[in-house]
Amino acid sequence: MSSSYDEASLAPEETTDSFWEVGNYKRTVKRIDDGHRLCNDLMNCVQERAKIEKAYGQQLTDWAKRWRQLIEKGPQYGSLERAWGAIMTEADKVSELHQEVKNNLLNEDLEKVKNWQKDAYHKQIMGGFKETKEAEDGFRKAQKPWAKKMKELEAAKKAYHLACKEEKLAMTREMNSKSEQSVTPEQQKKLQDKVDKCKQDVQKTQEKYEKVLEDVGKTTPQYMENMEQVFEQCQQFEEKRLVFLKEVLLDIKRHLNLAENSSYIHVYRELEQAIRGADAQEDLRWFRSTSGPGMPMNWPQFEEWNPDLPHTTTKKEKQPKKAEGVALTNATGAVESTSQAGDRGSVSSYDRGQPYATEWSDDESGNPFGGSEANGGANPFEDDSKGVRVRALYDYDGQEQDELSFKAGDELTKLGEEDEQGWCRGRLDSGQLGLYPANYVEAI
């Protein structure tokens, strides 16, 4: 029996994951198909980013439009108003830049990948790509002779291992027969002949196994050379894809990186100049001259009566009757419109064009605090018959000095209809006057 024989050698040979094993070239072939799919993935990636750029640009435009209108209608004035408005201008310009990013991504980067993919991969009528089939055929042709030798080698090895197994079994039987009295000399001779025959089979199969192994060793260099040649062709194809996609990614980076865009830098240079141009003293002087002590005034002068002139209507007579929009603020008797009272500190609810009370008179006919009945201008807050009793549905804590506070279930007197801002005038049983949310009460 061959001394190199071991029963472990009868176990199935473990296949390795090496490229040189039969069929393991398929990973290299699959890489070609993967390259085509990765081009599609990159185009989808770019397309999604373009959608994000477009949406962000539109959001900036909408935001700038809304706030530009609010600022124009709001109370801010002068150079600071212009500085604030410059933020909206920045948004519009940046929006345009993001739209440019979107256009560059779609019209340049995506189209570049699409055209390269079309030139690099050629579809076949029967499916798949020409490049994939060429690689598959090249590897198969290079591997075919060696694969045939490997098949012969596997068969020779299997025959040799089987002969060794038979030899060991025959020797075991022959040795056991010597200790058994029932075995005749003739049977003993047959067992010995079997052992001799098995030894001859082992010798023959070993010689054949070694010869085939030698042949495989001789064909291996040529096999490796042929496989390397096909593999290098695949490497060159893949190198083109890798280099190309790297260039595309750099183009994408250049289009996305607004920090290196001269127009983007110019936008913020202009914005900073606009903000630094705001001058508090200039704004204060402007307000003084247009809404403060610096305004011109037609001071009262003695005017002779002229019977030939028509009756001159005073400003008070021309002034339209105040709507229900008069609200008492506190015990000092200050008055403000309900539209102003309804504005709770947000410029979005402010209207620069809203009217302001420009007339003041101690004439009780126009003074809601006057109590004389002779002038027909009785205080509406002093007569319960002119109010409506209501009950609070919820607790409310006044946020401003002109607002009432009450608890759910408290009763008070409603002294006017709900204004456009959702507020009503009312009076608590304690006599306090003020505003409250109209939807916080119900009629009794």
Swiss-Prot record:
Residues carrying Phosphoserine: S2, S79, S346, S348, S349, S361, S365, S405, S430
Biased composition (Polar residues): 329-351
Pfam families from the UniProt entry: FCH, SH3_9
Compositional bias of kind Basic and acidic residues: 314-324
Modified positions (Phosphothreonine) in chain numbering: T184
Residues in coiled coil: 26-275
Region entry Disordered, spans: 173-194, 309-386
UniProt-listed GO biological process terms: actin filament organization; negative regulation of endocytosis; neuron projection morphogenesis; plasma membrane tubulation; positive regulation of dendrite development; protein localization to membrane; synaptic vesicle endocytosis
Membrane topology according to the record: Peripheral membrane protein
Post-translational note: Phosphorylated by casein kinase 2 (CK2) and protein kinase C (PKC).
Domain (SH3) ranges: 385-444
Oligomeric and partner information: Homodimer. May form heterooligomers with other PACSINs. Interacts with both COBL and DBNL. Identified in a complex composed of COBL, PACSIN1 and WASL. Interacts (via SH3 domain) with SYNJ1 and WASL. Interacts (via SH3 domain) with DNM1; the interaction is reduced by DNM1 phosphorylation. Interacts with DNM2 and DNM3. Interacts with MAPT. Interacts with EHD1 and EHD3. Interacts with TRPV4.
Family statement drawn from the similarity comment of this UniProt entry: Belongs to the PACSIN family.
Protein name as it appears in the record: Protein kinase C and casein kinase substrate in neurons protein 1
Species of the source: Pongo abelii
Originating gene: Pacsin1
